[in-house]
Amino acid sequence: MGTEVVAVALPGREGRIAEKPVTQLHTLVDMLVKVLPVDLPFAFFGHSLGAIVGFELARQLHERSMPLPQHLFISASLAPHLCRRDISRARLSDAELLRLLEGFGGTPREVLRHPELRDMVLSILRADFNLIDEYSVPDGYTTRLPITAYAGTMDNNVSLDRIMAWDRWATDDFSLHLFEGDHFYLVRQRRSLIGSLLGKWHEGT
């Protein structure tokens, strides 16, 4: 039997661009739990914010006594217990957010120069920061999963020690794999990343 990849399109993005972005993580996870197919073995892959969404989704599945992912693949993300900030980045001015976005890389300059597109991107970024900057792992959560972490060697946004901190939430099966590139290394390293993901997934299934 082959492996099926199911992509998650969040409100306010891609084909759902006309919808209002979700700003509360529990609301987003509730939406995902309702549509998640759990009748076959599955794993989660999340890049940046998506890694935290995957972690919290797994936590909610555990809380509801539903099947858990057999593996959690995270990319370019700090560990969940390090997310919460005293002041959310969603409160930054447009100019401050824009500088932050430029530091991430991955967004074409043409988009940032176009007022309407730039405002749309900043709106999504604010929603993302609302999701992640006020998140904290609830007390008493002890379930551990096999976790594989990925990162770019030149990612200036997430330090390796913050990525390595994911081992706190892993079983003995934790590993880190580095690819040449920045926060969006996976754009150029897609083929190698997919090969690694499938290889690790097939090892455990």
Could you tell me what each predicted segment is?
Residues 1-205:
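Non-catalytic, mobile gating and regulatory segments of ester bond hydrolases
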